[in-house]
Amino acid sequence: MVNRLLDKIINEGYDISYDEAVRLIDEDIDKVLQGAKKLRKVFCGKHVDLCSIINAKCGKCSEDCKFCAQSIFYNTNIKTHPLCSYDEILKLAKENELEGVHRYSLVTSGRGISGKEFEDILNIYKKLKEDTKIKLCASLGIISKYQLKKLKEAGVSRYHHNLETSREFYSKICTTHSYDERIQTIKNAKGVGLDVCSGGIIGLGESFIDRINLAFELKNLKIRSIPINILMPIGGTPLENQRKLNNEEILKTIAIFKFINPKADIRLAGGRGSLENYGEEAFLSGVSATITGNYLTTQGNGIKNDIKLLNKLGLTV
């Protein structure tokens, strides 16, 4: 089955069906991983897109996402801080640019950004556009089409907004805003001409079918950058005792996402540390992009280490 699907996807531009994706769950894992590797090679080549983030505003979030350390609903003892200064944001941007990172994103806690805070962020992006050559991304929550247009005018080229999980499982993860609000934000971003980065988190307690449903939702939205985060349970959150996924289940999930979205960059994101060798095998199983450096509330592998790893695998940045 795997070889037949590969031939049709590569040579005929075939989109696999939902039933075919479900059947991949029970296929031999080595065949599925090798198939995803071939799809990455055909559609994305050897290049790996590197992006980095700064936790530009941390904590005191009004939303109740059950995996998140920054929600006001949970006692996680994280250090909160208001919007970082421009000097802090510029320093990290320049460091990342010098180390070879392609994209840099401000990430802010909260449902969304408005008022003076949004104006401050616009000014930050305008200055970054002048002071660096790195591509600029933004992850500011649920915001309006007007705000997205202003971000684009300020120099942002890509907006990040995860769906997190399937529509069917979503209510078990978040109740303070809807799945449709997330989808509308994505549509608004695309509507003003921004590229969109959107994916989710695996290991929340969802089924493999939920992951496939998410992958098809992203396909229908024509997302070309799909970050896959792996839950790292955080003390104080409702998911602090959630079972961790094993290496094989994570890799097979990533590979099936690639079969469903062959032309998209599957981006290895938060939780890489739960994979052997920081996801070395994932880069040979469909992944063609990664967040490098540190994440929002957890540590990463380091930019130099990531580039060294990718070069060892014969990949380029």
Curated annotation (Swiss-Prot):
Q: What is this protein called?
A: Biotin synthase
**Cofactor: binding comment:** Binds 1 [4Fe-4S] cluster. The cluster is coordinated with 3 cysteines and an exchangeable S-adenosyl-L-methionine. Binds 1 [2Fe-2S] cluster. The cluster is coordinated with 3 cysteines and 1 arginine.
Which UniProt keyword terms apply here?
A: 2Fe-2S, 4Fe-4S, Biotin biosynthesis, Iron, Iron-sulfur, Metal-binding, S-adenosyl-L-methionine, Transferase
**EC supergroup of this enzyme:** transferase
What processes does the entry annotate via GO biological process terms?
A: biotin biosynthetic process
**Pathway assignment:** Cofactor biosynthesis; biotin biosynthesis; biotin from 7,8-diaminononanoate: step 2/2
Question: What is the stated purpose of this protein?
Answer: Catalyzes the conversion of dethiobiotin (DTB) to biotin by the insertion of a sulfur atom into dethiobiotin via a radical-based mechanism.
Q: Which residues take part in binding [2Fe-2S] cluster?
A: S105, C137, C197, R267
PROSITE patterns per UniProt: RADICAL_SAM
List its EC numbers: 2.8.1.6
Q: Known SMART domains for this protein?
A: BATS, Elp3
Subunit details: Homodimer.
* Residues in Radical SAM core domain copies: 43-272
What NCBIfam families does the annotation carry? bioB (TIGR00433)
Please name the source species. Answer: Clostridium novyi (strain NT)
State the family it belongs to: Belongs to the radical SAM superfamily. Biotin synthase family.
Known cofactor(s): [4Fe-4S] cluster; [2Fe-2S] cluster
Q: Which domain of life is it from?
A: Bacteria
Instruction: Detail which positions bind [4Fe-4S] cluster.
Output: C61, C65, C68
Known catalytic reactions:
(4R,5S)-dethiobiotin + (sulfur carrier)-SH + 2 reduced [2Fe-2S]-[ferredoxin] + 2 S-adenosyl-L-methionine = (sulfur carrier)-H + biotin + 2 5'-deoxyadenosine + 2 L-methionine + 2 oxidized [2Fe-2S]-[ferredoxin]
Q: What Gene Ontology molecular-function terms does this entry list?
A: 2 iron, 2 sulfur cluster binding; 4 iron, 4 sulfur cluster binding; biotin synthase activity; iron ion binding
